[in-house]
Amino acid sequence: MVGWAIALHGGAGDIPIDLPDERRIPRESALRHCLDLGISALKSGKPPLDVAELVVRELENHPDFNAGKGSVLTAQGTVEMEASIMDGKTKRCGAVSGLTTVVNPISLARLVMEKTPHIYLAFDAAEAFARAHGVETVDSSHFITPENIARLKQAKEFNRVQLDYTVPSPKVPDNCGDSQIGTVGCVAVDSAGNLASATSTGGYVNKMVGRIGDTPVIGAGTYANHLCAISATGKGEDIIRGTVARDVAALMEYKGLSLTEAAAYVVDQSVPRGSCGLVAVSANGEVTMPFNTTGMFRACASEDGYSEIAIWPNN
């Protein structure tokens, strides 16, 4: 075994290269903080499942990412959050969607995995399950910020479902690349080759109430097995159609591709250009973070000393 490794993301999309410093720096700082948190946890011997949950919780608590506190609004001005988590060794997994009051959806997804015979709970039943297990909840107004109200207003004015960090067009007001559609995720592997993946999001601005994206769909936005762990981000419908996360693992399992080869093939060939990015680690400590969008907020580190925090290609 090569050793531990970790990778995380804060969303992929059309992130303009001239993203203002006041939008860029807080996100880069958050990625650095979360990466350091994950590294410390892995070095202290925490299982990858704990590490992935810990990092995603921290990302959910950061208002500049579209998950937890920063979740964007539906067409009706409400929040509907979703998340999933998976353990590679056992293939146990949990997923939730339609959450309106849960502070950390990723932790509720883990409770579904550990406390029920099921994989997926949604909407009122998931909220009731959260209350029954003492999960931290708040009034839904906690998530409805002035910034997200403004984003929804803009999306409605132009009759669109707002996609990831959309580059403004001449008919669309300049949003500084801050459409706040960044799914968050983390994958981790320890020195024994144990793997885990976790992903969380608020979805699209102006999405239909009840819409479910790729994030809570095991095999689409999240997957882990004995070979690798993957967390995807981007346009959910395309990621679901491409079964992105599972396809990376399948190419490794059935075709013998390396993690980097498998992930690159899926991102380049299985989904439309401009629709997807992912972070992934393998059981031997390999890390890859490909994307076919303008940029992806991402960070990684491995036991051999390599680390990276980046947004655009080659930066």
Curated annotation (Swiss-Prot):
Is Hydrolase there in the keyword field? yes
> What Pfam family is a match, any one?
Asparaginase_2
The enzyme class is hydrolase
Modified positions (Phosphoserine) are 169
Please name the GO terms that the record assigns under molecular function.
asparaginase activity; beta-aspartyl-peptidase activity
Q: Where is the active site?
A: 183
Q: Which reaction does it catalyse?
A: Cleavage of a beta-linked Asp residue from the N-terminus of a polypeptide
The keyword Hydrolase is assigned to this record? yes
Keyword list (alphabetical) reads:
Autocatalytic cleavage, Hydrolase, Phosphoprotein, Protease
Which amino acids does the record list as binding substrate? Answer: 211-214, 233-236
Q: Give GO cellular component annotations, separated by semicolons.
A: plasma membrane
PTM per Swiss-Prot/TrEMBL = Cleaved into an alpha and beta chain by autocatalysis; this activates the enzyme. The N-terminal residue of the beta subunit is responsible for the nucleophile hydrolase activity.
What does this chain do?
Acts in asparagine catabolism but also in the final steps of protein and degradation via hydrolysis of a range of isoaspartyl dipeptides. The affinity for Asn and at least 4 isoaspartyl dipeptides (L-beta-Asp-Ala, L-beta-Asp-Gly, L-beta-Asp-Leu, L-beta-Asp-Phe) is quite low, KM being greater than 4.0 mM. The enzyme is inactive on alpha-aspartyl dipeptides.
| Summary of subunit composition and partner proteins | Heterotetramer of two alpha and two beta chains arranged as a dimer of alpha/beta heterodimers.
| Protein name according to UniProt | Isoaspartyl peptidase/L-asparaginase 1
Organism listed in the record: Arabidopsis thaliana
The organism's lineage is: Eukaryota, Viridiplantae, Streptophyta, Embryophyta, Tracheophyta
